[in-house]
Amino acid sequence: MTEERATVRPVTLSRLVEVTHVCEEGTKSTDEVKAALDVSHRRARETILEAERISLLSERGNEEESVYATTDVGESFLESVRAEDWPQVSSILATHSPHYKAFIETLENDGQGDLDALLERLEVAQEFTPYSFNQTGIEVVGDWTERLGRVQRNAFSGSYYLKDRSEVPPNFHFVLLEAYDDFEQTAGVDLRQRYLSIPRLREEVCERLGCSREDFDDALLALCQQNVGKLELSGAPLDSAAKDAALGIKKMERSNEGGLVTTSQSTQQVMSGVELYDKQYYYLAVYDSDITFNTEAS
């Protein structure tokens, strides 16, 4: 095996799935991986070596030519991908990838942070280990965590945070009102905008609570229906700035193209509002902050 590299290689999650699948049915040389993935020799080597570091592949063969085979860990990895069990895929990476584990741990220990803040924390945390991070490394591992749903990234501020709630808490409405007030204050006295962007509120509240965007939408709709006359949803023109995000929302799903188990990845640049009775709403207005929230009805 080649001498261990300190930083994570720039390999996408879909490539890790592909190379593990390619080597599943028998050992493969670098040239065979190169042909199967339709990539350059350099890219094939990067992918193989990172998959080997994570224990998805093992090196075999002699000094003349190394070949690679999928390990038991790799088999479990593929089984979880086929089942679209993304939490289990995340668990496997957290166990076997030192960079993935370190990324998650710094968010668990120190809370959310943008790229620069995480880089500073990780440099300190990894000082006495064989591993290190640079900006590219954080973007690579951050991409893995986002696509697996373990981490979300505020699409406006770029802050990473753990998605560690399975449902919104009973104080959802208080956190929403706090975020609403904060945005109202930063909008400026002259603007006096009663209607605030739902996509921006969603990103802020999800970061504060560590909840999923889908759970936010469900809770917001329930809250509005439970407090008619106090909260109001409003639509917006198609070119509304309320829908424009600085960053996309990354997702993953399994696909079977040409018999190869891989992942399709989409980055949603335009963020959706919330939908009620087949209509999209992009703004929220608060007329009375004396509201209640029944989680059982959400």
At which residue positions do the language-model features occur?
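Short, conserved, surface-exposed binding loops centered on an aromatic residue
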Residues: 190
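Short secondary-structure junctions and interdomain/linker hinges
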Residues: 183-187, 227-230
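Long, low-complexity, charge-rich intrinsically disordered regions
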Residues: 203, 217-298
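Donor-sugar nucleotide-binding helix/loop cap in glycosyltransferases
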Residues: 1-185, 193-200, 205-209, 213
